[in-house]
Regions:
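Catalytic Walker B motif of ABC-type/P-loop ATPase nucleotide-binding domains
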Residues: 150-154
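The feature captures the beta-strand-to-loop junction immediately N-terminal to the Walker
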Residues: 35-37
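ABC transporter nucleotide-binding domain
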Residues: 168-252
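Conserved ABC transporter NBD signature motif
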Residues: 57-68, 72-73
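ABC-family P-loop ATPase nucleotide-binding domains
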Residues: 75, 81-138
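Short loop immediately C-terminal to the Walker-B catalytic DE motif
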Residues: 156-157, 189
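A short, flexible loop at the N-terminus of ABC-type nucleotide-binding domains that lies
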Residues: 1-21, 28, 70
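Helix-to-loop junction immediately C-terminal to a conserved catalytic motif
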Residues: 50
Length: 295
């Protein structure tokens, strides 16, 4: 579905941000969670994938190279985010008629059908919609021209739990036919824990790893117990340990640490814990620790 090879983008301006040598492959039918701290380069990467920023390297979407076959590539990309790209002052029906002309395979009947399915009034002006309703309207439009790659930038930020549940269900439905893929950039890692198949972790403009979520998280264990017990864990197994007054918590390499002590409790890290301890273990530079443990 999506192949990115040696993508490189140098931004102008005071910060001169550099998106450096990004390569990964997201197969059809899968969801990727894009994570990293603010300023890591997530939005810049998404804008390169959208074609909003020109970059060197190759971006191939459903067989179409974004640099050499941009028109065909854009036909299969859907951008769903906080701001949107639609005229705020027209209603949803007119929105479909106007913007649908830009896509060869746009189907107005499908679009109206999705509006009905998402409980959206076709006569409602776009600017009158809530953030959650705007996301549904954008999805309805994208599904109506046959988009294959869906790019979401912080789609559930600031939204209530009910909409988040609805959104996660929609995402799993989107990829269920095996023909579509999704990249979600989000700080709400508990959402990604539930639906992401892959994790892409960025830091300072570099993609430090792109791994299947279960494999990445399953490579480690979070261990909690009395301070003196945790200190007995072999040093070569410890990625990072946080010591408290009476108890400590550490992330350890699963294959290098077999625990039999009942005073030590363990669980598989979630995405938030994984990133937290990788960063801490790398002394605020996760690149070293990632290369050490993931190769």
């Amino acid at each position: 579905m999506l192949r990115v090879h040696e993508l490189d983008k140098k931004m102008s301006g005071e910060d001169r941000f550099h998106l450096e040598n990004i390569s990964f492959h997201l197969p059809k039918g899968y969801i990727c969670g894009l994570v990293g701290e603010n300023g890591a380069g997530k939005t810049t990467l998404l804008r390169c994938l959208m074609g909003l920023y020109r970059s060197t390297g190759d971006i191939v979407i459903d067989g179409h190279n974004l640099n050499s076959d941009e028109a065909a590539a854009r036909e299969v990309i859907a951008v769903v985010g906080d701001e949107g790209f639609f005229d705020e002052n027209i209603n949803l029906e007119k929105l479909g008629k106007y913007y649908g002309q830009m896509y060869v395979r746009f189907d107005m009947e499908k679009y109206l059908g999705y509006l009905e399915r998402f409980n959206l009034d076709r006569k409602q002006k776009y600017k009158k919609l809530s953030k959650g309703m705007k996301i549904k309207a954008q999805l309805a439009f994208a599904l109506s021209y046959g988009a294959k790659l869906f790019l979401f930038d912080e789609p559930t930020a600031g939204l209530d739990k009910h909409f988040r549940e609805d959104f996660l269900r929609l995402c799993t439905e989107l990829v269920s036919d095996g023909g579509k893929s999704i990249i979600i950039s989000s700080h709400i890692t508990e959402d990604l824990d539930r639906i992401a198949d892959y994790i892409a972790y960025m830091q300072a403009g570099r993609l430090l790893f792109f791994k299947p979520k279960d494999a990445a998280c399953g490579h480690f264990r979070i261990v909690t117990g009395p301070v003196y017990k945790c200190k007995l864990i072999p040093r070569e197994a410890v990625v990072y340990m946080e010591e408290g007054t009476y108890s400590s918590t550490a992330m350890v390499i699963r294959d290098k640490c077999i625990l039999v002590d009942r005073e030590l409790q363990e669980h598989t890290p979630d995405i938030r814990e994984l990133i937290h301890y990788l960063v801490k273990g790398g002394k605020e530079n996760a690149e070293n620790i990632v290369e050490k443990y993931f190769g």
